[in-house]
Amino acid sequence: MDKKRVAVFIDNSNVFHNLYDFRKSDASWVCLYDPFLLAKRLAGERKLFYTGFYCVRPPSYLIAGSEEDKRRYNITQKYYGLIEKNPSITVKYGDLKGGIGALQEKNVDTQLGTDMVAMAALNQYDVAILVSNDGDYRSAVENTKRFSKKIELLFFRGSASMSLRSVCDITRRARLSFFKKMAGLDGF
């Protein structure tokens, strides 16, 4: 029997904020995780066909800010640069709109949801694994299932959308062991 083809869709902003919150009470959680190792872990013995990493670049105003702001900007740029170098990961950037203290992400959810449905329509995978707590993906999941695809959800405790969880075939809670620090970020 052929192995199922798996596509992993990572909403990094959602993941990062959850990991950051967990890290406040348990320093062993890593925010700058390796998305490819996460995807491989989630795919298991199945064939990992696609790893999509959806994110936004850090705001440029951080460069002119405090030393801590500059450090955060540089860490994020280095982190995304390392991810972009991995040919097994597709990185897609959304936009930040608004001013300092009132920034909003735009187009991350849209890109991820569109890719999930379009790739299902093209029969590029058998199983989609969504890594997010965001209920905005419910419509994308429902439309993906119209193409007879299975949907798995990796969610974070405490803030997972019940609406999203209810339409997924399999739900798993994120575990510390799923997130390994990205190599090359020593000193950060």
Predicted region positions:
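Nuclease catalytic cores that cleave nucleic-acid phosphodiester bonds
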Residues: 84-188
